[in-house]
Amino acid sequence: MIYTMKKVHALWVSICLMLNLAPAPLNADSEEDEEYTIITDTELPPLKLMHSFCAFKPDDGPCKAIMKRFFFNIFTRQCEEFIYGGCGGNQNRFESMEECKKVCTRDNVHRIIQTALQQEKPDFCFLEEDPGICRGYITRYFYNNQSKQCERFKYGGCLGNMNNFETLEECKNTCEDGLNGFQVDNYGTQLNAVNNSQTPQSTKVPSFFEFHGPSWCLAPADRGLCRANENRFYYNSVIGKCRPFKYSGCGGNENNFTSKRECLRACKKGFIQRISKGGLIKTKRKRKKQRVKIAYEEVFVKNM
């Protein structure tokens, strides 16, 4: 009798277990299908970065400090926090979320367009063409700093740099000589009393400077991470001159020189001056009345 009751009890337990487990595969399949559908239906616009280094993975460096920093994540398309060791690493590292967004997010482009001076070319116009890492075959335009013209190239479809325009007109308005598209909304004009024509007001940086040096000379001055206060020089590509700054003693970038002469030797190569009338381009030549320029030109030619 006891054996029969145990057998019946075991049978009912088996039936209950079968009923509870039977729907599980169906639910699992439906959940997988639902999750798959969500993934495939999600489409994001092509990612176009302002700088290629914004695509670098976060690098905490070889040191062991614990410092809160931010990097741009190309997968989430957002600036995120990571722990930095205090030395080394790469350029995709920012001290604040705001700085990260300002440098790497596309939303900041409109702000740059509205505030850039009319006679200045943006720094990214001097960057070389960069097709990116993808394998697309998209026609785009870039500004060639050697030919001084906008030219066509094939873009892979992702990453690259900001010297990348969808139309030839957009490229010309932004980077070629003359009045480019980077205008301040309230930018005024003044009437020329001689020819009764409107001419732009003078800007803080003359438009007749052209830069042809190494690409890393375009980097801004970087004080670094330590607490020293060393006198160094960096090349300011906007005005074409080497300027002093205070270096902390570690970190920073390659645009960092112990002397002004060393800075000029590295970054002044190919620096030319364009005559404003007629748009002609020529290098500086020796003139008897300009002894200072002669001495400078001798050094310049020697280091070519």
UniProtKB/Swiss-Prot annotation:
Disulfide bonds join C54-C104, C63-C87, C79-C100, C125-C175, C134-C158, C150-C171, C217-C267, C226-C250, C242-C263. PANTHER family: BPTI_KUNITZ INHIBITOR DOMAIN-CONTAINING PROTEIN, KUNITZ-TYPE PROTEASE INHIBITOR-RELATED. Transmembrane segments: none annotated. Keywords: Blood coagulation, Disulfide bond, Glycoprotein, Hemostasis, Protease inhibitor, Repeat, Secreted, Serine protease inhibitor, Signal. The record marks K64, A65, R135, G136, R227, A228 as: Reactive bond. This is Tissue factor pathway inhibitor. It is found in: Secreted. GO terms for biological process: blood coagulation. Glycans are attached at N145, N195, N256. O-glycosylated. Residues 54-104, 125-175, 217-267 form the BPTI/Kunitz inhibitor domain. Residues 1-28 form the signal peptide. GO terms for molecular function: serine-type endopeptidase inhibitor activity. Inhibits factor X (X(a)) directly and, in a Xa-dependent way, inhibits VIIa/tissue factor activity, presumably by forming a quaternary Xa/LACI/VIIa/TF complex. It possesses an antithrombotic action and also the ability to associate with lipoproteins in plasma. SMART domains: KU. This inhibitor contains three inhibitory domains. The first domain interacts with VIIa and TF, the second one with Xa. GO terms for cellular component: extracellular space.
